[in-house]
Each structure stands twice: as structure tokens, then as C-alpha cells.
Amino acid sequence: MKQRTLSIIKPDALKKKVVGKIIDRFESNGLEVVAMKRLHLSVKDAENFYAIHRERPFFKDLIEFMVSGPVVVMVLEGKDAVAKNRELMGATDPKLAQKGTIRADFAESIDANAVHGSDSLENAHNEIAFFFAAREF
């Protein structure tokens, strides 16, 4: 089924200048970039986006990391896009990620793990709406 999902290339990957390599992974695996923007998240935006994690012990560090530099936010479209994106990203902890996944190849740690991807179709809809207006597609 053709779906859309959200992907965020995080500050650590921008600092390493691997944005193009990550986008190539998506495109060469059947995911089309249908919307994209580069921005610097405010603390408020990061807190609102990651509100589901507000009570978790890592929340403060996550917010500090996500506002530490610019990010690239994208909408990816393709067959089973949510699952495909998660497969391409690999495990949250790059040490556990399979060789050839984005996190295994480009991430430093469980915190600086290069990319974010929606974990469900419902969350994909909400996350896309957080960053993009319908007219941007």
C-alpha cells in the first residue's frame, strides 16, 4: 500500500555532511521525497514534537540534541513507506543496527542516531501535519 511517512535527518548527520547519502538510501529503495525543508527547531517545537517522551528520563537530552543544529525534515512516499523507512534506518542504537542501515553507517550513539522516522501510519499523519501544510505536497 502506498503510504507517506516522516523522516528527520538529525543534527549529527548534518554536521557529518551525509544528508545526500541518506536521501540516496531512501530514493534507491523506492521511497520518493515529496516534501523537504531544512530548519532549526526551537526548544518549544522540539518539546511539542517529542511530547510523548516528556516524562522519560532522556527527554531533556533529546531536546537539547534536536535544537543543537539544523535538521532536514522530509515526507517520504512509497509502498509501505513507514515499514520501509524503519527498515532502512535500522535499530535505534547504532551498535545494534544491521550493517548497511542508515544508523549503522552514519550514527554515533543511541542519542546521536542520525535519523528519526515515524513508527506507525497514525503517527506519520500527525508528524507530517506538525511540519507541513497540505499545500506543500
Curated annotation (Swiss-Prot):
Cofactor: Mg(2+)
This protein's UniProt keywords: ATP-binding, Cytoplasm, Kinase, Magnesium, Metal-binding, Nucleotide metabolism, Nucleotide-binding, Phosphoprotein, Transferase
Source organism of this protein record: Helicobacter pylori (strain J99 / ATCC 700824)
GO-annotated molecular function: ATP binding; metal ion binding; nucleoside diphosphate kinase activity
Subunit comment: Homotetramer.
BP-aspect Gene Ontology terms: CTP biosynthetic process; GTP biosynthetic process; UTP biosynthetic process
InterPro entries: NDK-like_dom, NDK-like_dom_sf, Nucleoside_diP_kinase, Nucleoside_diP_kinase_AS
Major localization listed first in the record, in broad terms: cytoplasm
Active site: 116
The name this protein goes by in its record: Nucleoside diphosphate kinase
Enzyme Commission code(s) on record: 2.7.4.6
Described purpose of this protein according to its UniProt entry: Major role in the synthesis of nucleoside triphosphates other than ATP. The ATP gamma phosphate is transferred to the NDP beta phosphate via a ping-pong mechanism, using a phosphorylated active-site intermediate.
Places the protein is found: Cytoplasm
UniProt: ATP binding residues: 10, 58, 86, 92, 103, 113
Coiled-coil stretches: none
Catalytic reaction(s) noted: a 2'-deoxyribonucleoside 5'-diphosphate + ATP = a 2'-deoxyribonucleoside 5'-triphosphate + ADP; a ribonucleoside 5'-diphosphate + ATP = a ribonucleoside 5'-triphosphate + ADP
Gene: ndk
GO CC terms, sorted: cytoplasm
